[in-house]
Each structure stands twice: as C-alpha cells, then as structure tokens.
Amino acid sequence: MKRDIDRLLAERNLDAAVVRGSTLDSPTVRYLTDGHKLEGVIILLRPGRPGVLIHNPMERDDAALTGMETALSTRWDLRSIANELHGDLLAAQAEQMRRILADYGVAGRVGFYGHGEIGQAHALLSKLEQTLADVDVVVEFKDDLFTTARITKDEGEIAAMRDVAGRANAVVAALADMLSSRPAANGSRGSKAHLLAPDGQPLTVRHVKQFIHEQCVQQGLEQPGGNIFALGADAGVPHNQGNPADLLELGKAIIFDFFPRPVGGGYFHDMTRTWCLGHAPKEVERAYQDTMAVFNLVMETLEVGKRTSAYQSITCKYYESLNYPTILTAPGTQVGYVHGLAHGLGLEIHEAPSFHAYEGNMAVVERGSVFTVEPGLYFPDKGYGVRIEDVVYCDEAGAFHSLTPFPKDLLLPVRK
C-alpha cells in the first residue's frame, strides 16, 4: 500500500526515489497520482515528506488534484538545458535531474523507477551515474519498491476493483444470455449443429467478439489485451485468442478469458469461464469436474503467510494424482496442466505476487492482496481445453473473497 512506501524506502536504505513517466504508460505513475491524466512527469519521494510532482504547466489542474506538492517543469526547462549543451538531449535530461535533486537537497542513495524503452532507460541511467556526483544511482530488477507496495491494496483500491469486477461480470452475463437466446441450426454439408445470428446466418467468433466490445462500451470498459474466446482445439492452447471465422458449434469446449479495465486505464479484472453449448462430451465434462475440484481445493487451503509457490505444487500434485501430465514433472509439456496457477492483479494484468514454483520465489499470501486462481487442462490434439478463473481478495482479517460471482456452469442451454 502507499502507506508502506516510507518503510520500503528505509528497508532499501534509499534517501529518495524518482519516478518518471506518464499515467497511460507507467502503472507506477498512475498509482502515485491516483490515475489523474498526466504526461511526462517526474515524481520525487523522500521519507517522511510529501511527494513532489514535477509537471507540464498545461496539466497544472490535474496535478493539483493528486494532493502532492507540485512544481512546474519549466523551472528546469529541458529545451533551455539542451540548448546549453549543444542539443545533446541525453546529457540535458541528466543535467535536468541533477538540478532538480540539487534544488531539493537530495543526495545519497536514490532509486530510479518508471517506464521507458530498455535501450533508452539504460542510456539515461548510465548518463545519470556519470552526471550525479552526490548520488548513488540505484535500480532494482525484482520485487522493486513499487511492485512490492502494490501487492497489497487499500480500501479505495479494493472499491475500484470491486467496481470493475461488477462491470466485467455484467458483460459475461450479457454474453451468456445472448448465446442462450440464439436458435441452433442442424449441421449440413459437413458442418455440425451451430448457433444462428439474428440474420439467420451462422453465429461466429467474430460476432461474439463484436458483441463483447459493444457490451464493454456500455459498461465503460476497454480491452487493451483483447480477449480469449477460443473453441475446440484452439481452446487447447491457453493464449489462443480464437479464430474469428469459427462457428459456435454445439458441444465444443469454449474458453472465454475476459480481462478488461475501465476506459482510460485503471484496475483490471480477469475471469475465465469454460462453456459447452447445449451438451458436453464426456471427456470435456470429466476434465472440467477435475479442474473444478482443483479450484475448490486451492480456495479451501488459501492461508495468510503461506508461500504462494505451494499452491502451484498443490495443483500439479492433484492433477498428477488423476494421471494428467503437469509442468511439475514434465517441464515444457503442451498437454495437461501447462501454466501457472495464479498471478497478482491490479494496475497491470500480471503483477506480484508470483505463484510460480521456482527456487527464488519467496512470496507469501498477504492480507490486502488480490490475485487470480485459474487452474486448467489443455488437450489441443483431442480438440478441447478447460479453464476456470476467479479474482480473489484477502481482507485485513485474513478471509478470502471471490470478486467474480458469475456462475461456473459448464453447460450453456440453447434454444431448441
């Protein structure tokens, strides 16, 4: 949480932290500015003191809404500095930072964070090391200050996540109702029984994705990563987004993975349901029941303070007890259980904590954390895959709550 930033600075022995970027491209900037639209800002944080937001004069009104101390970037005008340095923009950015830190009396260990192309970031950090005589430039690769702070959410963040969850679940409910309302046509000329669109033509994945988009517009949601609506063998490849030309055939496994956020950015929701229209093949039904059993087992055993990697091991061992291959004993397998169980969720679709079972993963389940639970089985050669995914919140009392109330029924009824 934001209230932990001073503690995290102290734990890292940092005298200050500098964050660069824009609300739209840097989750850390969005986090610190409460999502107010700002571009190309510099944020200076020092223990026990208000944060300083250095911003373009054109954005002074939005900057004032953040509650931070504000300063106009023209006080350290980058163009003027670049002219002094004969047009060397890299040297100018480093010199601008030197002047800012000097004016605020910052010296010692300073961590640098934000967003940028890797080459540009490396060049700037290297130049800063050369330019900042009184500063030790500190960078973090894993579990950095703000990644760690964002693992736990405060009441305002949870309210935002509940809000986007409600809207996302409304979209999924509307889609399920639409699919169930469509009549089915008997197969002909080699095609199988499938749903019909309102114009009497076959309903396709393209139609479904357009419907999802329209529902998102109504709910004020956007899908920066698209969505997954994959049928049959495509559902057997976890991140296959689906073939737009595919017909909505009865009895085929459908994986619908939906991960929207509010228009303009904000907190994500992430949910997956597996459906079969009208009826389900026995093999799909069995895989679904086994996956539902894993999901319930994980939910029943969630515990504050327990290593997150333990839940990946629990999942693999349960699936293996049912003779499914998993990545625990068959690394690289493309059938069976092939991915991680869960991931943190927030301003990014994948964030800390990690639930992967590797030696260096020391993450534990924490109060205030929000994460997915998403076991699944994949058999592209057999023409199906199944996955079930909810978003889970651990409250301050250590109780766990699903933020994804939409039913987990495999079968979607269709009109006769």
Residue ranges and their predicted role:
Residues 1-416:
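Active-site neighborhoods and metal-handling regions in enzymes and metal-associated proteins
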